[in-house]
From Swiss-Prot:
Protein name: 6-phosphogluconate dehydrogenase, decarboxylating 2, chloroplastic
Active-site positions on this chain: K203 (proton acceptor), E210 (proton donor)
UniProt keywords, alphabetically: Chloroplast, Gluconate utilization, NADP, Oxidoreductase, Pentose shunt, Plastid, Transit peptide
Gene (UniProt): G6PGH2
Job description of the protein: Catalyzes the oxidative decarboxylation of 6-phosphogluconate to ribulose 5-phosphate and CO(2), with concomitant reduction of NADP to NADPH.
Length: 508
């Protein structure tokens, strides 16, 4: 049981002394944790903060004072931190996923009481959250795994929040989360996602869609640059213009900004910083988890998978440079395989259409994965509500999420976004431009794995008769796996080799 004698805070802002005891505390004061704590305090909720290193506690309290004397109480030991909170206590963790979460929980649990709650706001593997829910329940402690999206700026000014686990833990701080979350015309960008590890799983898929989005945008840039010869300044203008239309989104907006930034280390001031960045993309694992889950649930997610493969291949920088040298020595051109004379305005418009259609495929794949997992786990995920809370604060926030929400509102059992009437119409209208862009990229030798995978996904999904019949015949021949017929029910097996030899003999 917790002691009734909490230690005084090690440091606090001037406003904290007159504030009531906090209902909520936050442990883990790296960039995301510090900014979320200040966000909560700015919304009028006193908050206690704790970190293993005292310097980050002091830095957070100093920021709280500098940013408006926000009610933040800093603690340097877990006991004083926990006992500073009024009951039922809620402790938010924003530490590195995995062992660090378990270690932080172990440090805090001795001072928590039954009915208190732990909220893990990291990018955690959902099964770890489900394990911790059971462990916490054995002590009478409530637990939430809460996805937090929006990066540093979102954490400070309003993220998208995806909590899942014990609904009582959510209800205890619902008012706080609704104030701290990003706000749109449809309300706060937070909702109780579902039980168990639902919140972390939804955030994982959000990140998988994010991988796809970023890959598609990078491919659009590459085609504009290499086929159209657009300068960084022109590309900045293109993305800024796109952000005023159907492609309006956080990622398109920041892409436009990136192309306006000069290299601060270039004395001439003429070079773009983006051109000096090594072409190796980092990752933290959520994209890989998304692709693994899609495979386990038999959900096709080729756009997201292509984006993950793209990151893997980008990491092979030395191998790619060596391969280019070997192939050039054998006669492979070092530049474009084919020079394409194209009007820039037409190219920009067609790339816009290809990017939009490809993005729909990426979101469709993510939504289908969410539904499949929801069915498997009995989470009863509301896809329209998830689209709603992604409209603001998060990295994949986009104008067309409102239309995705409406599509699932119209039909919660929608098989695929591609067959929603509105999106279907747009896909058909854009397919010619989409095909043109992918074809020109192939002709020129420009890699567009995301757009190509998206187009193949679209063509495969709309095809009423695939060549899978031949694959099933092959499986039956070498493995006796049987097959179904289109003209009668049941499973069938054929002695293919015997019949083929007999047929070949008869032909001779």
């Amino acid at each position: 049981m917790a002691s009734p004698a909490p230690a005084p805070p090690a440091a606090s802002s001037s406003a904290a002394g007159s504030a009531p005891p906090p209902r909520i505390g936050l442990a883990g004061l790296a960039t995301m944790g510090q900014n979320l704590a200040l966000n909560i305090a700015e919304k009028g909720f006193p908050i206690s903060v704790y970190n293993r290193t005292a310097a980050k506690v002091d830095a957070t309290v100093s920021r709280a004072e500098a940013e408006g004397a926000l009610p933040v109480l800093g603690h340097r030991d877990p006991r004083g931190f926990v006992l500073s909170l009024s009951r039922p206590r809620t402790v938010v963790l924003l530490v590195q996923a995995g062992r660090a979460v378990d270690a932080t929980i172990d440090a805090l649990v001795p001072y928590l009481d039954a009915g208190d709650a732990i909220v893990d706001g990291g990018n955690e593997w959902y099964q770890n959250t489900e394990r911790r829910i059971e462990e916490a329940a054995a002590r009478g402690i409530l637990y939430l795994g809460m996805g937090v999206s929006g990066g540093e700026e979102g954490a400070r000014n309003g993220p998208s929040l995806m909590p899942g686990g014990h609904i009582d833990a959510y209800n205890n701080i619902r008012d706080i989360l609704e104030k701290a979350a990003a706000q749109t015309e449809d309300g706060a960008c937070v909702t109780f996602v579902g039980p168990g590890g639902a919140g972390n799983f939804v955030k994982m898929v959000h990140n998988g869609i994010e991988y796809g989005d970023m890959q598609l945008i990078a491919e659009a840039y590459d085609v504009l640059r290499r086929v159209g010869g657009l300068s960084n300044s022109e590309i900045a203008d293109v993305f800024a213009e796109w952000n005023r239309g159907e492609l309006e989104s956080f990622l398109v907006e920041i892409t436009a900004d990136i192309f306006t930034v000069a290299d601060p280390l270039d004395g001439s001031g003429g070079g773009g910083l983006v051109d000096k960045i090594l072409d190796k993309t980092g990752m933290k694992g959520t994209g890989k988890w998304t692709v693994q889950q899609a495979a386990e649930l038999a959900i096709a997610a080729p756009t997201i998978a292509a984006s993950l493969d793209g990151r893997y291949l980008s990491g092979l920088k030395d191998e790619r440079v060596a391969a280019a040298g070997v192939l050039e020595a054998e006669g492979m051109p070092s530049g474009l395989l084919e020079t394409i004379n194209v009007d820039k305005k037409m190219l920009v418009d067609r790339v816009r259409q290809a990017l939009y259609a490809s993005k729909i495929c990426s979101y469709a794949q993510g939504m289908n994965l969410l539904r499949a997992k929801s069915v498997e786990k009995g989470w009863n995920l509301n896809l329209a509500e998830l689209a709603r809370i992604w409209k603001g604060g998060c990295i994949i926030r986009a104008k067309f999420l409102d239309r995705i929400k409406k599509a699932y509102d119209r039909n919660p059992e929608l098989a695929n976004l591609i067959v929603d009437r509105e999106f279907a119409r747009e896909m058909v209208q854009r397919q010619n431009a989409w095909r043109w862009v992918v074809a020109r990229a192939v002709e020129a030798g420009i890699s567009t794995p995301g757009m190509s995978a998206s187009l193949s996904y679209f063509d495969t999904y709309r095809c009423s008769r695939l060549p899978a019949n031949l694959i099933q015949a092959q499986r039956d021949l070498f493995g006796a796996h049987t097959y179904e017929r289109i003209d009668r029910p049941g499973s069938f097996h054929t002695e293919w080799t015997k019949l083929a030899r007999k047929s070949n003999g008869a032909a001779i």
